[in-house]
Swiss-Prot record:
The keyword Kinase does not apply. This is V-type proton ATPase subunit G 2. Residues 56-69, 78-89 have a biased composition (Polar residues). Pfam families: V-ATPase_G (PF03179). Subunit of the V1 complex of vacuolar(H+)-ATPase (V-ATPase), a multisubunit enzyme composed of a peripheral complex (V1) that hydrolyzes ATP and a membrane integral complex (V0) that translocates protons. V-ATPase is responsible for acidifying and maintaining the pH of intracellular compartments and in some cell types, is targeted to the plasma membrane, where it is responsible for acidifying the extracellular environment. The gene is ATP6V1G2. Its main location: other. Residues 26-90 are annotated as: Disordered. Transmembrane segments: none annotated. The lineage of its organism: Eukaryota, Metazoa, Chordata, Craniata, Vertebrata. It comes from Sus scrofa (Pig). V-ATPase is a heteromultimeric enzyme made up of two complexes: the ATP-hydrolytic V1 complex and the proton translocation V0 complex. The V1 complex consists of three catalytic AB heterodimers that form a heterohexamer, three peripheral stalks each consisting of EG heterodimers, one central rotor including subunits D and F, and the regulatory subunits C and H. The proton translocation complex V0 consists of the proton transport subunit a, a ring of proteolipid subunits c9c'', rotary subunit d, subunits e and f, and the accessory subunits ATP6AP1/Ac45 and ATP6AP2/PRR. Belongs to the V-ATPase G subunit family. It is a peripheral membrane protein.
Length: 118
């Protein structure tokens, strides 16, 4: 009986060691999965930062040329507005005189299609 009891004890100890090994293996697997997940997350973040930086540089290049274009357009617009204002100042008196002349000098005329009924 003692040998059976000793055999059972050995089996229980072996089962306990096996359970511990399985638990350790599961813990190692969980740690490896967690580490792999963290590494993948870091790679994703690094890739995202690289793409964002690339996008920002391309956007700056595009906006820089567009900024120069808008400055040129604004300058041309200012020149045109100044030209129109100076033209208005030069021709103001002449246009007012012409307008007043047309309003005040009324010349009554009979319309060419009017027929005098006899």
């Amino acid at each position: 009986m003692a040998s059976q009891s000793q055999g059972i004890q050995q089996l229980l100890q072996a089962e306990k060691r096996a359970a511990e090994k399985v638990a350790d293996a599961r813990k190692r697997k969980a740690r490896r999965l967690k580490q792999a997940k963290e590494e993948a997350q870091m790679e994703v973040e690094q890739y995202r930062r690289e793409r964002e930086q690339e996008f920002q540089s391309k956007q700056q290049a595009a906006m820089g040329s567009q900024g120069n274009l808008s400055a040129e357009v604004e300058q041309a617009t200012r020149r045109q507005v100044q030209g129109m204002q100076s033209s208005q100042q030069r021709n103001r008196e002449r246009v007012l005189a012409q307008l007043l002349g047309m309003v005040c000098d009324v010349r009554p005329q009979v319309h060419p299609n009017y027929r005098i009924a006899a």
